[in-house]
A protein has these predicted regions:
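Internal, hydrophobic beta-strand segments that form the core of beta-sheet-rich folds
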Residues: 24-38
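Beta-propeller blade-edge and WD-like acidic-aromatic loop motif
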Residues: 34, 71-89, 113-132, 156-184, ...
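Low-complexity, Pro/Ser/Thr- and charge-rich linker/hinge segments at domain boundaries
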Residues: 41-68, 135
């Protein structure tokens, strides 16, 4: 175990089924892993997991660090796991390619592309082809509309800090990168941290950091 000797354990489908079937209600799941190599025993490493009740539909996109699939201990990037798949696949890799948001319909992803500045939107229906690339962080951790058409920039994550590009929270077209004039938002909301749309796109929630001490 550890950085000098990383190990990966991949439970079988049957094992995951048994785990999820057994972990019901509020019962926690305890996982203990011991490594045996060359006559030496390392561990155990023990963790307690709480399995959420319910099912997830569609593809899951997530940030990853140090994955052997992306290149090992120093790698960073975005990966995805598809329904019934046993192994994740890379979407984007490299420094900065972790801070992302995917649209609810699975069509569009927005993400950081570089540090300290750079972001882009991607077409998830076309092998994550770039839709629009920006030299600032307007798309980084943005609140993306359910159909992927627009994104509200997430302030207080490099987007409005002087020197990092970007500015006050704005609404952008994910395909063109153009700013969409929004009278009810522009000049009213300046710092909108962690924005997220409701599933029907009728509401948006965020931490308003320009007033109210960051209250939602």
């Amino acid at each position: 175990f550890g950085a000098s000797s990383p190990a990966r354990v991949t439970p079988s489908t049957a094992m995951w089924t048994a785990i999820t079937m057994a972990a019901t209600g509020t019962d926690p799941l305890t996982v203990s892993v011991t490594k045996m190599s060359g006559g030496a025993v390392t561990g155990p490493i023990t963790e307690t997991w709480k399995i959420a009740q319910g099912s997830l539909r569609g593809i899951i996109y997530y940030e990853t660090y140090g994955s052997p699939i992306l290149g090992g201990i120093a790698s960073v990037g975005i990966m995805k796991i598809s329904p019934s798949a046993t192994t994740p696949t890379p979407v984007e890799s490299g420094c900065g390619n972790v801070c992302h948001t995917a649209s609810a319909d699975g069509s569009t992803l927005v993400a950081s592309t570089a540090f300290p500045a750079g972001s882009a939107s991607y077409d998830l229906t076309n092998n994550a082809a770039v839709l629009n690339a920006k030299g600032d962080n307007s798309f980084t951790y943005g609140g993306i509309y359910p159909d992927g058409s627009i994104v509200v920039s997430a302030t207080n994550y490099r987007t409005w800090v002087p020197g990092f590009g970007g500015g006050p929270s704005r609404v952008y077209d994910t395909h063109t990168g153009a700013t969409i004039p929004t009278p009810s938002w522009d000049g009213v909301i300046t710092n909108a941290a962690m924005p997220a749309f409701s599933p029907d796109g009728q509401f948006i929630v965020f931490n308003r950091e320009d007033t109210g001490s960051g209250h939602m």
